[in-house]
């Protein structure tokens, strides 16, 4: 629903996002991102209903969010294969005071990682 690519100095705060057909918030190759006080609502039986999927990003703060996800609640991804190696890892990710309900995994690392 919200996809950010190669962005800097972003604040997502105090919004409710629900019933995305796939992942809800997807920052990719971003730097200096804060996701604060966001509510994600997704049916428990939704496929690929990830809450927040951070990929190849740095200096990210995920704080005070409530996530009701059909799949992964908060997920770190580095990309698969050669694209993952070329785009770089997730670096300096800080996750604090989040509530995750009904997810297959509250916090997940490694579903797409190279190297």
Task: Set out the residue ranges of the language-model regions.
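Extracellular/periplasmic carbohydrate-active domains that bind, remodel
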Residues: 1-115
């Amino acid at each position: 629903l919200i996809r950010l690519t190669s962005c800097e100095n972003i604040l997502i705060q105090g919004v409710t996002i629900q019933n995305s057909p796939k992942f809800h918030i997807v920052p990719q190759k971003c730097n200096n991102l804060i996701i604060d006080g966001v509510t994600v609502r997704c049916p428990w039986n939704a496929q690929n209903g990830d809450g927040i999927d951070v990929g190849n990003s740095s200096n990210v703060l995920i704080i005070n969010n409530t996530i009701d996800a059909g799949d992964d609640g908060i997920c770190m991804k580095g990309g698969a294969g050669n694209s993952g190696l070329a785009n770089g890892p997730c670096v300096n990710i800080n996750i604090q005071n989040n509530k995750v309900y009904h997810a297959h995994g509250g916090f997940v690392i490694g579903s797409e990682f190279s190297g």
